Amino acid sequence: MGSKMSDPLVIGRVIGEVVDYFTPSVKMSVTYNSSKHVYNGHELFPSSVTSKPRVEVHGGDLRSFFTMIMIDPDVPGPSDPYLREHLHWIVTDIPGTTDCSFGKEIVGYEMPRPNIGIHRFVFLLFKQKKRQTVLTAPLSRDRFNTRKFAEENELGSPVAAVFFNCQRETAARRR
């Protein structure tokens, strides 16, 4: 039980608010601008996350396929996230041991634009039962529901997740 409580995904309320508790079984790395690695709970500035990151799957093999979802559960703001969740990106059919560029982008990358407070931006990786299990994109980016999407597309529980914090940059902080 002790290890669950110290899990950064539990502390960051990703587990609970976005997905149910799961045991990671695959390693996923997310890197912006080839040098900014995403670590759970660390802060990145909006100016450094404008272009899509490299998301690598360190697991499975070329015959296994994964779906990656990026969401913001803190819209419009973390104190009253009544628009939860906002969908930022979905890539499906990513072969194991490769990265998102080898998959099929069904929802294009949308850069984080947090207006109120500190937002969490969450990357979730799901293992597909087979290729082309996720065929249709959600109708809207607004009020996306990761649990429901995973259920509708038979994705099961996530196999990996990582999140970063991001807040609006003020002119003073940019200097």
From Swiss-Prot:
Gene3D superfamilies: PEBP-like
Tissue spec. comment: Expressed in vegetative axillary meristems but not in the main shoot meristem.
Subcellular location: Cytoplasm
Protein induction: Down-regulated at the onset of flowering.
GO terms of biological process kind: negative regulation of flower development; vegetative to reproductive phase transition of meristem
GO cellular component, one term: cytoplasm
InterPro entries associated with the record: PEBP, PEBP-like_sf, PEBP_euk, Phosphatidylethanolamine-bd_CS
UniProt xrefs under PROSITE patterns: PBP
CDD domains in the record: PEBP_euk
Keywords per UniProt: Cytoplasm
Family, similarity comment: Belongs to the phosphatidylethanolamine-binding protein family.
Function: May form complexes with phosphorylated ligands by interfering with kinases and their effectors.
Protein name (database record): CEN-like protein 2
Gene expressing this chain: CET2
